[in-house]
């Protein structure tokens, strides 16, 4: 492979089209992400970070460009097709011909599994099916039929996908952990797995029976490219000896010399034994696989390379450089173009002849196209381009066009068709005119639905907004502005409703001023967690008295399951009451939620609240809605729902969950899970199921066949959540009724009595007949949990009704059907009448700057004033609001999603604390290991005895150690300034608690290691003392317990009134996720002068106790004991009145040694 030379063509920048003035303030990266040669014509396809796909000819002249992915979604993969090009984004797949005309475009709205995609490849040489894979474990590998434009197949695949390639009958899938799988697309099974690279696969190529890969390994906490390229022979399914990259290629930088590894690898398309190996430094080799010593080396002159591609003819190599310029190498002779089989001729536009017309054209000649009349050139600004401030107009609203008269028969026929074919009207679902003969019509601009029109949104600096979250002015005006919850105009969202982001300072989260966002005694929740959207739902149920009392009462019993939402939610609510307005976290609850497999299948493990199941899709698992047609018992339904029993497949057309948002699906899943866990807890007792009595809605499902056989079935189900939809979609009788002046009551009442006609196969006569299905609620539980699922058009109508979300109503059961009215006098019945009041609701907030998020409203009884007050919870911002503002949903940016109505008597019940119940303390006096008792366990503690039972005020010394599950997320500005976006995710690894008083003072009675089977990024051995294998239940010799066991021990000590002594207890308790009041903590960080640095435990022990601790790795028992001795020293210095003098001396001496002990200086 000699005689290669750099092309004479001048490099061309590929991102020139992204450097527009209107993107000047866009911080999104503007770069080329993917490059591919066309297999049939002389074109190069390039995708960028804004979803554009461009094609260039051999002279780098632009041929076509089109937007393949909407919403500035980056292009992650390109594939050449015989009819055009395939482009893959994170949540969409685009297929366009070479003239940039879209032939197929599917998104996650069409195929729900199309989420977080990273790679794709063809399933066969026919190129009719393409397989896509990504990082979403619930999606697996998605096969899309390019001919029919729909989902063809789904392959179950439990690993995150990095790269995909196909050849002959197999597909090669590279995982993100460096492993390689060979997949048979005919049987959808993995036929072989190879251990590719230790960390990741960076490049891969697959041709005939040869597979080559280049990857990276981790050394010294850094990723370095491997020096060798792996080669696999798939005829014998074995790995061949690896091929080394250029041994004499080195890279000089920062005064050091580094060996260059392989970053790119590609097989030659013509010569089957030749492979091209390249590096980001520009070096590339041609190597003969049959004789690796035969190689030709070249080096591309540039700073770095981001993409390398070999043309189908094998005569060109294209490079994309670090500055997004494209450059090319070629052979000096025998060149045939990019492809040697060019059979397709490129099409170019036809240019009209602008010559003199043969003759004048009559103005009445309708056959003459107006598009052929040219426009004159202009050198002044057109009126249509003038700024909106010149006219100050919102634009002209088109007048309504009267519809032609339509017969009642046609109307009823169209209505019946729409109602029977779907649970929603056709126009509401698609926005297209219906097929019942209705004419097209112009609709007026809906300001309530779309907000203000034709108004330029002023630029607002996000950097200044972040500064306001961290820095408070002397007069506090910045924070006062952020607490404003009333809108100043109808265009902007009030500051209190914006999506909040925690800003980390020098000392992490301790610098954040949470108190400025909450002046109440009700705690907010941090946003530094996964699934942050759940905060609003948890806050709503926190202030439902009976739900709170039941969950907290469950803490009296032992439950050591790590996936118990019942226990974690009770602990969270107990912590929020104990915090009394201070910030809390729901991290333990999120850990339990993530440990339930069904939460992934439902898409609940996400920070986005936009994804919802779409119609015409199939979902595995038993339905979770009130229209489940499985006919199973309550226990079987709950087990299928929360445990992930996927034996049944139900179409979304059979339930009402096809339009539920992620928060609504989480609401349904949460209540079903809590019901299931309570049922499991009381399965061998005669106790009643409390949550079923509170939330259980008895739904009677009656199905009858409108045919001569008259088949009839009836069953009953218990559901905890009612999905509220429009009356028009629930019953035919509401079709001709207007809802302009109706509150939510007709929506609820019609959702409690649904009637639908469908075409189905009769189970008795086996004929396709019209089946009438009626679902009726037979009871009125004390709590009504509602998922409000309306279309955009239905919300536009509801927002115009004042008081649509009514604060109270009266209900009764009459003739086995619920009736809801605003006044009790409107209920003409002698049956019992129940009064319901709105307890709270969750609303979606949409603004111009950030993605949608949730806030919660709760109605709380104030015992001091004996009145109810409304509070708004926006994560850690808590604000009291007036009732009128809380119930106002007319704003375009606020839409209710979940609401809960409580019986008026339930709402007045008090919140009972955990201390009211008789608590089981036995775990403090015994062991409960995660994997049973073992003789090899090394115990360094002595259990408490009944005589040593802690009392209020008893001193205990505590220290906790953690391991890192992920690294810090840091943002680096153009000036080199680093900003911590999200700190590293940690996991509790070890907890040691020592006696603080008595004859055994300083002797530990708890020294538990917490079992961890997840991936650990860093054991932090130097600071935690945890070695690899210490937390593995199969290899560890430590006393391993589950996370819930150690949390209960600490919680019990807190309940007993113990005083905790330690160093840096704030961070320990925050990461453990438990709140301990300040009066129960004694932190040795009190050795601190205001405005000066904090002193480490090691330096304090040396300066005050003359002890050299932490010589090797940290030991939590030693650290807890040292903190206990330091606290006693503090009390002694306070008693003598010399504490301030000694503290000043410590700071003065420490300044000379930079606060280090002599051992550290050496």
Swiss-Prot record:
* Localization terms from the record: Cytoplasm
Q: Would the keyword Disulfide bond be found if you checked this record's keyword annotation?
A: no
Q: Which GO terms describe its biological process?
A: mRNA processing; nuclear-transcribed mRNA poly(A) tail shortening; postreplication repair
Main location as per UniProt:
cytoplasm
Annotated EC? 3.1.13.4
Q: For the region Linker, what residue ranges are annotated?
A: 341-491
Q: Reaction catalysed? A: Exonucleolytic cleavage of poly(A) to 5'-AMP
Fetch the Pfam families from UniProt.
PAN2_N, RNase_T, UCH_1
Q: Please report the stretch or stretches of sequence annotated as the USP domain.
A: 492-904
Alphabetically ordered keywords of this record = Cytoplasm, Exonuclease, Hydrolase, Metal-binding, mRNA processing, Nuclease, Repeat, WD repeat
Q: What is known of its domains?
A: Contains a pseudo-UCH domain. This ubiquitin C-terminal hydrolase (UCH)-like or ubiquitin specific protease (USP)-like domain is predicted to be catalytically inactive because it lacks the active site catalytic triad characteristic of thiol proteases, with residues at the equivalent structural positions that are incompatible with catalysis, and it cannot bind ubiquitin. It functions as a structural scaffold for intra- and intermolecular interactions in the complex. The linker, or PAN3 interaction domain (PID), between the WD40 repeats and the pseudo-UCH domain mediates interaction with PAN3.
Q: What is the name attached to this protein's record? A: PAN2-PAN3 deadenylation complex catalytic subunit PAN2
């Amino acid at each position: 492979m000699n005689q290669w030379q750099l092309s004479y063509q001048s490099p061309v920048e590929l991102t020139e089209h992204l450097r527009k003035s209107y993107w000047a303030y866009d911080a999104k990266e503007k770069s080329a992400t993917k490059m591919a040669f066309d297999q049939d014509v002389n074109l190069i396809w390039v995708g960028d970070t804004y979803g554009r796909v461009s094609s260039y000819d051999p002279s780098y002249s632009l041929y076509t460009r089109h937007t393949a992915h909407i919403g500035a979604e980056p292009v992650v993969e390109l594939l050449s097709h015989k009819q055009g090009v395939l482009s893959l984004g994170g949540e969409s797949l685009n297929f366009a011909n070479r003239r940039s005309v879209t032939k197929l475009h599917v998104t996650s709205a069409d195929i729900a599994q199309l989420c977080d995609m990273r790679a794709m490849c063809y399933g066969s040489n026919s190129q009719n099916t393409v397989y896509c894979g990504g990082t979403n474990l619930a999606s697996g590998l998605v096969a899309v039929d390019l001919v029919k434009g729909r989902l063809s197949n789904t392959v179950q695949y439990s690993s995150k996908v990095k790269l995909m390639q196909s050849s002959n009958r197999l597909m090669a899938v590279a995982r993100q952990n460096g492993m390689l799988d060979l997949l048979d697309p005919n049987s959808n099974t993995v036929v072989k797995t190879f251990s590719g690279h230790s960390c990741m696969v960076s490049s891969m190529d697959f041709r005939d029976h040869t597979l080559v890969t280049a990857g990276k390994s981790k050394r010294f906490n850094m990723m370095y490219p491997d020096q060798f390229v792996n080669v696999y022979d798939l005829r014998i399914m074995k790995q061949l000896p690896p091929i080394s990259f250029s041994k004499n290629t080195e890279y000089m930088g920062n005064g050091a010399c580094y060996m260059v590894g392989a970053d790119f690898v590609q097989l030659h398309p013509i010569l089957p034994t030749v492979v091209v190996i390249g590096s980001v430094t520009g070096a590339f080799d041609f190597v003969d696989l049959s004789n690796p010593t035969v190689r030709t080396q070249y080096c591309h002159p540039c700073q770095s390379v981001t993409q390398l591609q070999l043309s189908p003819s094998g005569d060109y190599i294209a490079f994309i450089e670090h500055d997004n310029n494209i450059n090319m190498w070629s052979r000096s002779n025998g060149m045939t173009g990019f492809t040697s089989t060019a059979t397709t001729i490129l099409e170019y536009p036809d240019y009209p002849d602008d010559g003199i017309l043969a003759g004048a054209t009559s103005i009445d000649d309708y056959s003459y196209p107006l598009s052929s009349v040219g426009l004159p050139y202009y050198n002044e600004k057109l009126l249509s381009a003038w700024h909106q401030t010149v006219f100050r107009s919102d634009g002209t609203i088109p007048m309504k066009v009267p519809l032609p008269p339509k017969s009642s028969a046609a109307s009823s026929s169209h209505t019946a068709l729409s109602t029977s074919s779907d649970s929603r009207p056709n126009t509401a679902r698609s926005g297209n005119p219906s097929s019942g003969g209705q004419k097209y019509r112009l609709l007026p601009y809906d300001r309530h639905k779309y907000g203000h029109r034709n108004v330029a949104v002023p630029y607002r600096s996000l950097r200044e907004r972040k500064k306001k979250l961290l820095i408070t002015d002397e007069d506090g005006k910045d924070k006062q502005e952020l607490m404003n919850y009333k809108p100043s105009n109808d265009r902007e969202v009030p500051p209190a409703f914006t999506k909040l982001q925690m800003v980390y300072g020098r000392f992490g989260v301790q610098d954040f001023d949470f108190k400025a966002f909450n002046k109440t005694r009700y705690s907010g929740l941090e946003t530094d967690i996964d699934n942050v959207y759940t905060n609003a739902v948890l806050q709503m149920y926190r202030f439902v008295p009976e739900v709170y009392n039941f969950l907290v009462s469950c803490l009296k019993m032992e439950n050591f399951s790590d996936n118990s939402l019942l226990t974690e939610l009770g602990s969270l609510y107990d912590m929020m009451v104990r915090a009394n307005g201070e910030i809390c976290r729901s991290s333990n609850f999120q850990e339990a939620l993530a440990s339930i497999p069904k939460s992934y299948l439902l898409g609940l493990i996400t920070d986005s609240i936009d994804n919802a199941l779409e119609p015409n899709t199939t979902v595995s698992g038993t339905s979770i809605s009130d229209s489940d047609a499985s006919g199973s018992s309550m226990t079987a339904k709950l087990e299928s729902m929360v445990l992930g029993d996927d034996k049944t497949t139900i179409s979304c057309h059979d339930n009402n969950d096809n339009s539920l948002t992620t928060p609504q699906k989480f609401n349904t899943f949460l209540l079903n899970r809590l019901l299931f866990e309570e049922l499991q807890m009381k399965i061998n007792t005669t106790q009643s199921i409390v949550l079923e009595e509170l939330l259980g809605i008895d739904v009677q499902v009656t199905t009858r066949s409108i045919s001569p056989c008259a088949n009839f079935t009836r069953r009953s189900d218990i559901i905890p959540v009612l999905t509220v939809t429009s009356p028009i979609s629930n019953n035919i009788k509401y079709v001709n009724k207007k809802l302009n002046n109706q509150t939510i009551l007709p929506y609820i009442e019609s959702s409690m009595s649904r009637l639908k006609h469908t075409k189905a196969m009769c189970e008795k006569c086996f004929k396709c007949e019209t089946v009438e299905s009626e679902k009726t609620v037979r009871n009125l539980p004390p709590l009504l949990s509602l998922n409000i699922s309306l279309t955009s058009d239905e919300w536009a109508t509801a927002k115009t009704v004042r008081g649509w979300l009514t604060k109270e109503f009266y209900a009764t059961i009459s003739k086995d059907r619920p009736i809801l009215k605003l006044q009790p006098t409107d209920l003409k019945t002698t049956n019992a009448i129940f009064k319901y009041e709105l307890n709270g609701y969750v609303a979606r907030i949409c603004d111009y700057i950030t993605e949608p998020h949730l806030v919660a409203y709760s109605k709380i009884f104030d015992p001091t004033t004996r009145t109810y007050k409304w509070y708004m919870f926006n994560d850690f911002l808590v604000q009291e609001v007036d009732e009128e503002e809380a119930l106002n949903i007319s704003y375009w940016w606020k839409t209710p999603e979940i609401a809960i109505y409580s019986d008026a008597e339930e709402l007045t019940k008090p919140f009972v604390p955990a201390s009211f119940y008789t608590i089981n303390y036995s775990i403090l006096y015994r062991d409960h290991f995660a994997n049973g008792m073992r003789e090899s366990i090394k115990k360094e503690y002595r259990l408490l005895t009944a005589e040593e039972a802690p009392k209020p005020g008893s001193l205990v010394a505590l220290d906790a150690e953690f391991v890192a599950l992920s690294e810090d997320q840091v943002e680096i500005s153009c000036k080199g300034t680093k900003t911590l976006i999200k700190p590293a995710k940690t996991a509790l690894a070890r907890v040691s608690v020592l006696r603080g008083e008595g004859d055994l003072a300083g002797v530990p009675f708890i020294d538990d290691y917490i079992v961890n089977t997840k991936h650990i990024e860093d054991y932090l051995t130097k600071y935690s003392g945890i070695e690899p294998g210490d937390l593995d239940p199969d290899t560890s010799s430590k006393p391993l317990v589950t996370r819930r066991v150690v949390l209960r021990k600490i919680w019990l000590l807190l309940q007993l009134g113990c005083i905790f002594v330690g160093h840096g207890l704030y961070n320990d308790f925050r990461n453990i996720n438990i709140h301990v009041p300040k009066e129960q903590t004694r932190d040795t960080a009190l050795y601190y002068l205001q405005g000066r640095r904090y002193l480490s435990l090691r330096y304090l022990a040396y300066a005050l106790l003359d002890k050299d601790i932490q010589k090797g790795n940290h030991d939590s028992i030693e650290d807890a004991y040292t903190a206990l001795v330091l606290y006693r020293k503090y009390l002694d210095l306070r008693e003598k009145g010399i504490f301030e003098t000694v503290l000043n001396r410590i700071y003065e001496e420490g300044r000379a040694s930079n606060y280090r002990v002599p051992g550290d200086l050496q």
